[in-house]
Amino acid sequence: MSIDKISMERIAQIILPVHFRTAEPVLILGEPGIGKTEIVLKSVRSLLTEAYGGSKPKAKKSKKTFEEEMNAALAETDEAEAEEVEAKKAKKVVFNVEDYYTIIDGSGMPSESLVIPYIDNDNVDRLQRDVIPEFKKAKAFFDKKENDGKKFIIVIDELSSFTQDDQRTIMNFIQSGLLPDGTFLPNDRLWVISMGNPPRSIPGFEESDSPTHDIESAVITRCATYFVEADLKGWLAWGAQSNDKGQTNLHPYLLSALMKLPELYNVKDREDVRYLINRSGYKLSQYLYEVEKMKEEGLDAKWNQIAVNSYVGSKIGTTLASTLEQLDKLISVKELFGSDKDDKIDPKMMNKFRDLEPFERYYLLMKCLEDSSPVNYKKDNNILKLSQLVREGQLPVETGKAMAHFILENRKNKGSNASILMDNKTLMKGGDYNVAAVIMDFQDQFRGIK
């Protein structure tokens, strides 16, 4: 019987919130590059902000009509703005989530480095021990009166890179809050989350090729220990969200290609050390975005096959590149939407759109939503055309899900395309739909289908 595994998405959603309340230590083990660190840090910041930053935790969602979902979204935005105004009036101290946690990265630590020896000439025992800055930050947090009753989080990344001696120091710290310099931190208000790569000695990870130290069983037995697996669905959901540049976290080329060819994800090649996983895929995505930016600057730039291979390996790279070539030849978003003066997609262009493969239609519609899109959604005609594409474009279910998710997740970014699409009410008169309503109604038809 193999060890049970869970996705990082589910750990963030249903596991970490409970452990945060109890302050019981957590250990997360999984292959490198699957997003452990990014997802844990995002969850940590979210939990701390909800607990101490003045934001209220969201209630569990039940099935709602479109009107209920839209009203709830708008009410949530209004409430957040009202809280911001009240905070300014009261001249409250600005909450900084960075003050409430720290990260110890084992991959950057020399051996036995949790303790820093130094000479103190004023002490009888001249050789003293100090602690690393991350532990000092925790001590300083608990020394402040305004933090009474509040929790501090220590995230230990790459636990399996620590030597056995350092792991024993961590074990004592997890068990009692004992620091290497002999001082104690209040264990009931200290939450430790450790992450690492599982050694081959753990069942189910015999083929693991990540270099690690064996993790002390004393550490494992003092934590709630979870084994995680690579999760394409969760990664693509994150990839379709907008970042602070108004772009999707993953380049639409990569999102579209993996919708078409999910079998390319997390496949190791015995003849190559490179493969497509969250970390390498994200770096490839950054490369594709930079090529796109160079084109916009008028430079002669094109993505290169060998550059794609450099991130994901020759075999996967060759297959992936053929899909990217296909997307390169697509009609552009500007061609698809035409003039701002037209309130409908040109019939010939609509037929071209319908004839595209599902992943190609997905790519074009996600490019339409990005803030870098050439489409001006302050023009009602373009709202009408996007609505038409959703209703008449014969979309795959996954595309409707991704579009609805993108709009709802990014609606709070003022001035973004998502917020414009959410706020636009002009299309509702005469029984017509706001484009977000079209998407949500589309989703209602397929609710329950995965």
Task: Tell what function each PLM region has.
Residues 1-450:
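C-terminal regulatory/interaction module of P-loop NTP-utilizing enzymes
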